[in-house]
């Protein structure tokens, strides 16, 4: 108030507000078979989703694989393997020596009300730590990755004791990472003359 006395004091458990119970689920499916003419095949798929113990963090992956082969002659085999995987990772800002959501939750005063917009939008403690809520709600660090692998083989039986096998494989990986820090985080703070930061 006008006399310098606190008119509103919150009681914030910042660690409780940034942490959550981690949750993981995984599913697998596979099908395989063959025929009398010497051909065979197998197909499989996998889905994995992990929720991080810090809110807004997690990992998702799905993958598929196909293997096919055939005995062309009694002395000749050939086959092909194909796999594809996609991963999506949401990182939390925990690898900073000076700032980061974990350090901020440990040192940010508990007398601030996390439900008050003035707390979220305040710069007066930027020298100490960023508001933990700011890292949860306005900081993003996402990595998407795609991987394709194909291989084929040709195997020739030259003698009962000797085989020749040729393998050919191609591996392709694509990664895309994007980061954004809102202006209430140390990385994107107005104190650093930055109104948000993207990368």
Where are the predicted features?
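Short strand-turn segments of transmembrane beta-barrel domains in outer membranes
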Residues: 2-30, 45-54
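Surface-exposed loop/interface segments of Gram-negative outer-membrane beta-barrel transport/assembly proteins
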Residues: 1-11, 38, 52-59, 63-149, ...
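Residues on the lipid-exposed face of transmembrane beta-strands in outer-membrane beta-barrel proteins
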Residues: 29-33, 64-70, 150-156
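A generic beta-sheet turn/junction motif
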Residues: 33-38, 47
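An active-site-proximal structural segment forming one wall of the substrate-binding cleft
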Residues: 162
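Outer-membrane beta-barrel channels and translocator barrels
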Residues: 24, 36-37, 73, 157-159
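Catalytic cores of large soluble enzymes that bind and process phosphate-bearing ligands
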Residues: 19, 23, 140-146, 150, ...
